[in-house]
Regions:
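The feature marks helicase ATPase cores and/or their adjacent C-terminal helical subdomains
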Residues: 1-457
Length: 457
């Protein structure tokens, strides 16, 4: 998308907007764009602030240029709907409302365009209503880029499922790391399997080669991905792209993180704090306590600053610090080395599965996956698969029977059961169109009172 943006800037006089769902990704893109323009030797930039805008998708009514939707509402005088008032339909409903208002205006008068080109990154996060809204306000072209596998169990958009062009090679991370991370996300070593493509061409479409062989157990698929020489100055054979650990308690998890950093500092003399990202997957306070502990040790032992991005209002990545985050702030970011820590049991947790796939594919060189006490079974199932991938470049997977693949209704049930209390409260209130901060607080107090009365009785 950056290459396309530069071409549009150089070859046209049009107004261009680059958008995505995540605030931290939008801020990261703003910081990376000037460096990319330098690399592409773009010298004429006097009108760049007028012609190129980078913003997240939603935004704020008080800051119209903070988001594409808020910009559109301000430009055309539409009713702005914030998150609290969005109801059960969320951003999809917000976009549908804006579309309806624009259609009314279009019927009464000519509707001017506010952009010539819109570039949408991480498009798998959006439904088709957002794409239609962008088309209505764009004179020339809406360009959509997505990773269809960042949602391993559902798709929001028909447009994203039917792309004009497909890039089935992965350049950011090693193909072996990608295959391991995706197969862990798909649950291919478990029963039931979360995702399986019935048509062989769908595996090929996704960049996989495979051979089949019959065994007593059933039909075995031997998957592989084409190796890619991503770095001219690094011998890729010296790099282990994926490492997995099982640690039964937080003490040993912290110890393992420090051992990894020690090893990286020893092997890479020019390593900087910003080369390392640490992400924990936990729906409880245990993850934040662990992150505080890791942050303190890093700052004391290495004299490196850390950035716990979830504590910051503006969520902009700082290049001089070790990045530490929960699962909510890693989309679109890239690191030389990524350390993922999984505290929650993920066997039945599809959201966490999705997060693990996403965070594990953030690394240029190596991703480290540390599994906590509740995931010993996952470690035992996937450690042998990783060893096979690293040694042979292949993964042998038994084709599951139809009864061993999760069906749509089962997936919906699992998604619902994996929600936190706060998420369940939010969903319930949105379903009743009663979502507000006051109602959230009231419902929490009510639940707390009911639990207390139950204990007393």
């Amino acid at each position: 998308l950056f290459h396309r943006l530069v071409n549009l800037y150089n070859q046209t006089e049009g107004k261009i907007v680059f958008t995505c769902n995540s605030k931290i990704l939008a801020n990261d893109i703003k910081m990376r764009l000037p460096k990319f323009l330098d690399q592409m030797k773009v010298s004429r930039r006097e009108d760049i602030d007028e012609r190129i805008k980078v913003m997240r998708s939603w935004g704020s009514r008080l800051k119209p240029e903070s988001g594409l939707y808020s910009y559109i509402c301000n430009y055309y005088g539409l009713d702005f709907i914030n998150y609290t008032m969005s109801g059960v339909e969320g951003f999809d409903g917000v976009c549908l409302s804006a579309i309806s208002q624009l259609e009314d205006k279009k019927n009464n008068s000519d509707l001017p365009y506010c952009f010539d080109y819109v570039l949408i990154d991480e498009a798998q996060d959006f439904s088709d209503s957002f794409f239609k809204l962008c088309e209505m306000v764009t004179s020339n072209q809406v360009i959509v880029a997505s990773d269809i596998f960042q949602k391993i169990y559902e798709r929001k958009s028909n447009l994203v499922e039917k792309p004009d062009f497909t890039l089935n090679k992965v350049y950011r991370t090693d193909p072996k790391n990608f295959m391991f991370s995706q197969f862990l996300g798909f649950g291919l070593k478990e029963k039931p399997v979360i995702q399986w493509f019935d048509r062989d061409e769908d595996w090929q479409f996704s960049g996989y080669s495979f051979e089949n062989r019959d065994t007593e157990e059933g039909l075995i698929y031997e998957f592989s991905r084409e190796p890619i020489n991503r770095f001219n100055d690094i011998n890729s054979y010296e790099i282990i792209p994926t490492k997995i650990y099982y640690k039964p308690d937080t003490f040993n998890i912290v110890k393992q993180v420090i051992e990894i950093i020690d090893e990286l500092r020893e092997e890479h003399s020019d390593i900087s704090p910003s080369d390392i990202g640490i992400v924990f997957v936990s729906k409880s306070n245990e993850g934040y306590k662990l992150a505080d502990n890791i942050s303190t040790i890093i700052e004391q032992k290495y004299n490196w600053e850390t950035q716990k991005v979830y504590e910051e209002k503006y969520k902009s990545r700082e290049n001089s610090k070790v990045f530490i985050s929960n699962q909510n702030n890693v989309k679109g970011l890239e690191f030389s080395f990524l350390i993922g820590i999984v505290l929650d049991e993920i066997t039945q947790d599809l959201e966490s599965r999705n997060t693990i796939y996403m965070l594990m594919t953030r690394s240029f060189l190596t991703s480290y996956l540390i599994l906590g006490d509740s995931n010993k079974d996952i470690y035992d199932k996937y450690k042998p698969m990783l060893e096979e991938i690293l040694s042979t470049g292949k993964a042998s997977i038994l084709k599951p029977g139809k009864e061993d693949i999760l069906q749509e209704e089962q997936i919906k049930d699992l998604i619902g059961s994996s929600l936190t209390l706060d998420q369940k409260i939010e969903k319930a209130l949105k379903n009743k169109n009663r979502f507000s901060s006051d109602n959230i607080d009231k419902l929490k107090i009510m639940i707390k009172t009911l639990k207390k009365n139950k204990v007393m009785s």
